[in-house]
Amino acid sequence: MKCVLVATEGAEVLFYWTDDEFEESLRLKFGQSENEEEELPALEDQLSTLLAPVIISSMTMLEKLSDTYTCFSTENGNSLYVLHLFGECLFIAINGDHTENEGDLRRKLYVLKYLFEVHFGLVTVDGQLIRKELRPPDLGQRVQLWEHFQSLLWTYSRLREQEQCFAVEALERLIHPQLCELCIEALERHVIQAVNTSSERGGEEALHAFLLVHSKLLAFYSSHSASSLRPADLLVLILLVQDLYPSENTVEDDTQETDSFSLPEEYFTPAPSPGDQSSGSTIWLEGGTPPMEALQIAEDTLQTLVPHCPAPSSPRRIFLDANVKESYCPLVPHTMYCLPLWPGINLVLLTRSPSAPLALVLSQLMDGFAMLEKKLKEGPEAGASLRSQPLVGDLRQRMDKFVKNRGAQEIQSTWLEFKAKAFSKSEPGSSSELLQACGKLKRQLCAIYRLNFLTTAPNRGGPHLPQHLQDQVQRLMREKLTDWKDFLLVKSRRNITMVSYLEDFPGLVHFIYVDRTTGQMVAPSLNCSEKTSSELGKGPLAAFVKTKVWSLIQLARRYLQKGYTTLLFQEGDFYCSYFLWFENDMGYKLQMIEVPVLSDDSVPIGMLGGDYYRKLLRYYSKNRPAEAVRCYELLALHLSVIPTDLLVQQAGQLARRLWEASRIPLL
């Protein structure tokens, strides 16, 4: 029984997500009255009525005490509530079936906030404008928007329960150097260069292209002018792709089962793709004429031989951190194209429009006014000494230039009003007046951002790559990977197997190795679905081990939050262990430090909530400014017959082996 709600301080619903059980509980609470013809209130109204006391009491406490509650459980512990205020929007997560704890609910809220940022960019910093985006006046648009984010939350919950990469929040690569090299060359030549040399691209610049097989990254290529993409942003893009084309739709052969023991750890190289005269079903689809005697067979079996490929989705506007003109800029507008090659295999292209530099200017100005607001809130003295602040002089120059170039009447008059109050020697404005003017300028800058990047988004009729150019890229990549298609789909389910580790590491049942500097992980396959299985099979043993691994991930996070970087304990017939450590670029282990202890209501540990590991690396690097520092994690499951000293020794050897393997550049 689950629910997520985003509301204003007045209990106006901006977004909600519920499962069937929660909806049923609402129907029981707001059951039919004596007049059976009287309709039940809309679900949105039911939620507003149910949670209004919680919202109002929380906001009142915040106003009166400058503090409020962030978590509580109802009588008898039936339901758990977690609340977090982001800007002017209150996020609430509820669980009533004891399947999620406080950390899980808080993580869900932070992921939802991150998804809002990816979709709306810097508009999320302004309470009034984000309300307009999340609650459009048109009911049809509102339903469509809410259904989109509801679907994303369902997809996130499914991936977190099924995929190791989402459980630990790290990227999982398909390990096959030869194929990866082939794909990188194809992405460079047939995607990035093909788009950027086309005269019909309309100013759009192709920056990044990557291939996904289910939720695993096969290859990634960036143009020379592109800045690096954060692992967290790449992981959320995988989430978006999985929402568009869920992996369970992949056509799999139910009659033929394979297990990991039947798949040796060897690479194979199929023959080059056939030319235009190739025989087989592909040429028939492209308009060739099959032999007459084969025509009926082809018609009957076409769907079996060639699974239906999903249609490409419409281009969509997304916002990702990037460098613009060698300056870091948060939430730069990009256009995302998801081009499915086959069910389960997708090509993703990211482009940037010529107006991207405007995002940098607006971001710098809004950041400057935010810092100015912070200074003004320190007291009246801060307002009096405003002109002497170096920050203000730089901000004034930037804003004068922007207003002159933009020429918008509204922001021009607001800026003149602000300057009259801030820099007047005879009648300087008070801190409260300056704060009010500051907020007004920020809102107008945010409105310009919204006008340029949201109202002109590709899905709202804005500019994007022509369809035939997208089709060309999709066709060329299909041709390149035709012979590898079946291998890739199997490889994605059997990426790494435990067989190759059992001889050197007896007693090892499972492991997850994460390079937190690059945000990438390595782990043996752990599938226990009806159609796919790992070495442990499909029975209760596979599900049992998976439950152990997921439980270890949660426990390791809780202990890391309390400052522990090593964990070793016995649970039944298993030893569970967790290690976090730092190394330099040469692979030498660095001296361990005491990591910060975090409160229970702090940002969740991971990449999607607030990129905890990037902050941890910065914290560690303070005392080593001249040395590149890397952070690693290892989670392992051993049989309890293994002595603990041997287990620790194995963990070190396993980490060394995986470190050496990860040196192969695949991106």
UniProtKB/Swiss-Prot annotation:
Motif range (Melanosome targeting signal): 665-667
GO cellular component: BLOC-3 complex
[DE]-X(4)-L-L repeat ranges per the UniProt record: 45-51, 147-153, 483-489, 611-617
Keywords: Guanine-nucleotide releasing factor, Repeat
Gene Ontology process terms (BP): melanosome assembly; vesicle-mediated transport
Signal peptide region: none
InterPro entries (alphabetical): FUZ/MON1/HPS1_longin_1, FUZ/MON1/HPS1_longin_2, FUZ/MON1/HPS1_longin_3, HPS1
Pfam family, one: Fuz_longin_1
GO molecular function: guanyl-nucleotide exchange factor activity
Highest taxon listed in the record's lineage: Eukaryota
Quaternary structure and partners: Component of the biogenesis of lysosome-related organelles complex-3 (or BLOC-3), a heterodimer of HPS1 and HPS4. HPS1 cannot but BLOC-3 complex (heterodimer of HPS1 and HPS4) can interact with the GTP-bound form of RAB9A and RAB9B. HPS1 and BLOC-3 complex do not interact with the GDP-bound form of RAB9A and RAB9B.
Its biological purpose: Component of the BLOC-3 complex, a complex that acts as a guanine exchange factor (GEF) for RAB32 and RAB38, promotes the exchange of GDP to GTP, converting them from an inactive GDP-bound form into an active GTP-bound form. The BLOC-3 complex plays an important role in the control of melanin production and melanosome biogenesis and promotes the membrane localization of RAB32 and RAB38.
Stated name of the protein: BLOC-3 complex member HPS1
Organism: Macaca fascicularis
Gene: HPS1
